Amino acid sequence: AGGKQILSDGPFSEVLRSAQEAIVVPPFVAIAVRPRPGVWEYVRVNVSELNVEQLTVSEYLHFKEELVDGKADDHYVLELDFEPFNESVPRPTRSSSIGNGVQFLNRHLSSSMFCNKDCLEPLLDFLRVHKHKGVVMMLNDRIQTIQRLQSALSKAEDYLIKLPADTPYSEFEFVIQGMGFERGWGDTAERVLEMMHLLLDILQAPDPSTLETFLGRLPMVFNVVILSVHGYFGQAHVLGLPDTGGQIVYILDQVRSLEHEMLQRIKKQGLDVTPRILIVSRLIPDAKGTTCNQRMEKVSGTEHASILRVPFRSEKGILRKWISRFDVWPYLETFTEDAAGEIIGELQGRPDLIIGNYSDGNIVASLLSHKMGVTQCNIAHALEKTKYPDSDIYWKRFEDKYHFSCQFSADLMAMNHADFIITSTYQEIAGTKNTVGQYESHKAFTFPGLYRVVHGIDVFDPKFNIVSPGADMAIYFPFSEKDVTCLTSLHRLIEQLLFKPEQNEEHIGVLDDTSKPIIFSMARLDRVKNITGLVECYGKNAKLRELANLVVVAGYNDVKKSNDREEIAEIEKMHRLIQEYNLRGQFRWIASQTNRVRNGELYRYICDKGGIFAQPAFYEAFGLTVVEAMTCGLPTFATCHGGPAEIIEDGVSGFHIDPYHADQAEKMTEFFVKCREDPNYWTKISAGGLLRIKERYTWQKYSERLMTLAGVYGFWKYVSKLERRETRRYLEMFYILKFRDLANSVPLATDEEPSTTDAVATFRGP
């Protein structure tokens, strides 16, 4: 007993508690130890001799490859290592600092300026070269040195302080121009003075907050390009189509909010500039009744934002049909070249900021940024590597259907090329104490027989920033605010959708007792979203079935309607579950709904019925539907794997559920029992969710933050251009020598109908 106690309290037990994986190749056991998020160590235990040795990353991955190849004798394997290029980049060391990159960077920059006044010179140079379409802004040639800048600022301060605060810039423009200042400081005397005070403070005693405020207010971003390549990118009748879901909603809401913020800032900067936002996506000639075959489409609710569509083409010509996001790789280089010409033509010059979305959009953003020398921001939405366990080491098993060697290589290049990366949650970057983050999983991995990644991405890199989005408040608002709208006129349509007994391609299943509250879920119908898992949990729980009905909005209910292999498998599974658990009378399956206004009212209608929203995904990077439901006041039960675990405070603003443990459906049962006993309990959880959204998840906060990040990282890109050049040369070499061949190995799609065998191909894990 004493020996066991010593073992359980000793260092080896700490190793076991922190172990993420173990590889057994007798007589050795190699263990990957993760004492805290972002920090990894590797050890190997000889079980026969009971000794322990520390391994390098390369040695551990070499040992791991033996699981696939047997005894690995190849000592000359291509290894990717980005660490040497990042030695000059400052980074935090505490796990709690991950995702707050801009704060750390501001501390570093202000500290450098404070300790060494020579570090102020890049700021002066940056302000002096600042132009938009050839027009000089901020400083002109009268100011050549820091001393001259300080003197001019003091002189301008003395002049401006005597003017009324609301004096328009035009009335004193020529006076301060003679001192060395151009447009961009502000639209009134008060705002110009405020900006000049910020710069004087930086020159005298720089601090992080002042530096961030100043850089964030600089007029730097007028033209933005947003890449979203795969799926059907449109504004109507697209949601629920293959590869078309939350990312589209995210970007359209982002663009509306971003344009509003840009217009406000440009006005306050005293500039007469028209901003432009281009969403660049794929043009699909066979558009299935959507607008995806139109080259240009104005974004509704905006003045200066458009969707620019560019087709996929090869030597065979333009590809007419949709193809899966897993099959786009051979088209992306040509797509990038074509898009570059279209972008420059539309904007009459280069953009100021390029934002990539998902793996394909991020690699295209990297190629465009590399070509144009523009600040690049990445948004992953979801990294597939964490969705499919062991998809790196057993990559060959996945390659024919998923081409993960291309996708993970593209992800790796894009995240190292980006100037800054936005995530919606901490977990997306570095996971939790017990789970590995999406980005963190790219720190070290191996493709046996292809290459090893010994240092892919460092989650402590200050390029990572958590900026959470919100829901469109014009569509998603609390159920208690219905008196401000006439949307209740939609209730007849909603009631038909939920309760009409007719069985057709839009809805199947009936609800016998329409007075019962509804468990509601809405998502794409694929394996990871796990809608069928929710249906199975419900089917197994007799008490829950007695207390509430289940309604899901997901995909098609007819396999003939879908060309997506995962969706087809899930459709077939759903039909099996309906029969197996005899769900008739308690379950309604509604096909995907693309009318967002009606969807918003649907959430509120479920509120009126005393229902809940369930989000059962195996993993959810963020959870936009969770935010939408909570914004409407609907109590929400969502996966504990990924973003929803941060959005929801368990038991306060909603509930966490673990989709890997079906018995957690009991949480929903307990909720409905409590609501029967205490009608105020539903209201309490609803109010908790609304408060959480108001505090953390709004598009206004998102856009303000994004514009500030663009300013700070634009300056950092200018300051650190020499260090970044080496990284980009390394990436360029990897792209040309390795990635191109991987992309070209993916078969080109055809416009012929897929065979039945291809259509029903499903995911098979190792």
Swiss-Prot record:
Q: What does this protein do?
A: Sucrose-cleaving enzyme that provides UDP-glucose and fructose for various metabolic pathways.
Annotated spans, GT-B glycosyltransferase: 220-698
Gene encoding this chain?
Answer: SS1
Q: Which domain of life is it from?
A: Eukaryota
Q: What is its EC number?
A: 2.4.1.13
The Gene Ontology biological process terms listed for this entry are:
sucrose metabolic process
Q: What class of enzyme is it?
A: transferase
Q: In what tissue types does this protein appear?
A: Expressed most predominantly in tap root.
Asked if the Swiss-Prot or TrEMBL record annotates the protein with the keyword Phosphoprotein, the reply is no
> What does the record give under GO molecular function?
sucrose synthase activity
Transmembrane ranges, per UniProt, are: none
Reaction equation(s) it catalyzes: an NDP-alpha-D-glucose + D-fructose = a ribonucleoside 5'-diphosphate + sucrose + H(+)
Q: Which InterPro entries match?
A: Glyco_trans_1 (IPR001296), Sucrose_synth_GT-B1 (IPR000368), Sucrose_synthase_pln/cyn (IPR012820), SUS_EPBD (IPR056736), SUS_N (IPR056735)
NCBIfam families reported for this sequence: sucr_synth (TIGR02470)
Keywords of the record: Glycosyltransferase, Transferase
| Family according to the record | Belongs to the glycosyltransferase 1 family. Plant sucrose synthase subfamily.
Q: What is this protein called?
A: Sucrose synthase
